[in-house]
Regions:
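Catalytic-core segments of nucleotide cyclases and related cyclic-nucleotide turnover enzymes
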Residues: 148, 152-155, 184-213
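Short regulatory alpha-helical coupling segments
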Residues: 53-56, 67-87, 118-126, 144
């Protein structure tokens, strides 16, 4: 038999142990079987497993959910919202003129922009909301149980937070960034999550055509 469990040491440290037990027959038939147990500290192994699991779900650059994990979670929330007829809001945002930022200020500056925008996205989340980077300069928010008026407030707050960002390039130039954002809500007629994504994507590109920063 093999078991894994946690213990708390006398110094307060949490450790993981692997405990293996097996029965060995005694060559001396006058005595019963011998029970052998081996305990091994597997704390480092567990920590590594946890880190690998974390890395499988996040975008390393921005520390937000990666595309695969975001849509896995979004699909579960979509199914729950359909099942229980609860509201669900979906938002897509794209950093305006990001290629120009990279070309003008360099890719390291572009990475910094992505990181700061992701921080803004995480800052507006409620408990249970999901934020992820789903493309180069494209992010998504999923807001379970969120009515349209509240979702609009969250979108406006996110716009304001990003508009406040100020960056300084290596040559001393100061610049800001804006986003174009598309918002949609679950409809009874939506057959799947992709229907919401398509609407949000269309709304986002409409915002870009109408002048961006909206």
């Amino acid at each position: 038999e093999e078991r894994e469990y946690r213990i708390i040491r006398t110094d307060g440290q949490l450790r993981w142990l692997s405990d293996k037990c097996f029965i060995a027959r005694n060559a001396d038939s006058t005595h019963g079987p011998i029970i052998v147990g081996i305990a091994e500290d597997i704390t480092e192994k567990k920590q590594l497993e946890g880190e690998l699991q974390r890395l499988a779900t996040i975008d390393v650059l921005t520390q937000s959910s990666n595309r695969r994990y975001f849509f896995e979670c979004a699909q579960r929330e979509f199914d729950l919202a359909r099942q229980y007829a609860t509201p669900l809001a979906f938002q897509l945002l794209d950093i305006d003129d990001f290629k120009r930022i990279n070309d003008t200020h360099g890719h390291q500056m572009g990475d910094q922009v992505l990181q700061r925008v992701a921080q803004c996205g995480s800052s507006v989340l409620r408990r249970g909301d999901l934020f992820g980077r789903i493309g180069g300069e494209e992010f998504a928010l999923l807001l379970p149980g969120c009515q349209p008026d509240l979702a609009e407030q969250i979108a406006e707050r996110l716009q304001r937070e990003i508009q406040r960002l100020v960056f300084t390039s290596p040559d001393g130039q100061r610049f800001g960034v804006t986003i174009s954002l598309g918002v949609t809500y679950l409809r009874a007629s939506d057959p799947d999550l992709s229907a919401m994504f398509t609407r949000a994507d269309a709304a986002m590109y409409t915002a870009k055509r109408l002048g961006k920063n909206q």
